Each structure stands twice: as C-alpha cells, then as structure tokens.
Amino acid sequence: MSQSMFDIEIHSVNTDGKTNAPIARLILAHGAGAGKHHDFMQAMASQLTGHNIEVVLFNFPYMQTMMETGKRRPPDKAEKLLTHFAALIDEVAKTQTSVPTFIGGKSMGGRMATMVLDKAESIVGAIAFGYPFHPPGKPEKLRTAHLETLKKPLLILQGERDTFGTKDEVSAYALSSTIAVSYLTDGDHSFKPRKQSGFTLETHIECAAKSTADFIKAHVNK
C-alpha cells in the first residue's frame, strides 16, 4: 500500500508479542482539526485491538500536508474527502488480509464514513464517534438527510452534552432504523465528562470501545 498516498497506520491484534488474526477490521478517520496521532484516535485504536479488532488509521491529504508543513489549513471539501476515503477502502480490500471490514471516524471523519457507507460494497457497517449533527449553536443546520435513508448498520456514540448534537436534540431526529445511538453520560464532543459526574474520559473511551466491539461482533456473526 502506498504510504505516501494514504499515510496509514495499522494497529494489529497482538497477544504475548504475537500478531493474531483479528475478528474484524475498522478503518478509522480523524476529525477536522486533529489527525491520526491525536490522543483520542490512538486511545481508541489501543482499546479496540484489545477486543481483537484491527484498526487502520490514516490522514486525509489536507492533514498530511499540515503535518509536513506545520501550517494549519481547513479540511478539503467533502467530495475530495469522500473520494480519498473510498480509494483507501478499496486499497485495504486489495492489499490486506480478508476479514469483515467496518469504517468509522471521529466527528468529521465519522460523518464521512456515514456518507460513503452505503456505496462501499466491501464494508459491513460503520461507527461514528461524536457525530456532528449540526454546527455548535446552529441546530437548524442539520447534517442528517442521508441518515434518514441509510441502509447499512451504523452505531453513533455521542456525548450527552455534545454541542454538535445533544441527547435531547438527537432523540428527536428522524433517523433510519439501521442506526443505533448510544450516549456517554455527561460527555462533551470529545466524550469528556465534568468531574462532578463521577465519570472520566478514560472510562468513557473504554465504554465506547466496548460498545463498538459489541456492535462489530453482532454484525460479524450474523
């Protein structure tokens, strides 16, 4: 696989120093402002490999350019992001071992995963971590039209206080019957809860990884 084109990072399933066959693979896309090396992406990958799920992280081209130049830049338009995501999915299918494959992402990356999901024949389902239902403070600008007709299974893991879509807001949306939404108690867009809630970011990431693994296993075993 071309590292220069796709800038991938594979987290294999290891036990006692040996690489084991995963039960599934998750291709995970990053959010708008931070790439594959962000703490959330690395922590989630680490948790998921503990559930025997191989994780493929990558940077979109604009993020790869940011890493190389050290200069911040906005994400490319959705069309370009989706083209890259689809090409990466095809490349993984051609060059990696054949296991049930899922896609997902954090925030923007999760949205891109949901938009490519039904068009990607090799993909079983998707997981969105903190889906950006609308821009913060603009609940009228919904990004849900395609979610109303989604055919493949999707799990959305959302902080209850997420400013891109709170629990109260999301529960009122008309979403496809193939979509399941699970909430992290008192979590924000990064799943971080307030101290007085009694929860921690670490336990929420563990919980999100467990929910992801359960979702994947349920659809692998169908």
Each language-model region and where it sits:
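Conserved alpha/beta-hydrolase "acid-adjacent" motif
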Residues: 163-168
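Gly/Ala-rich beta-loop-alpha elbow adjacent to hydrolase catalytic centers
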Residues: 105-109, 113
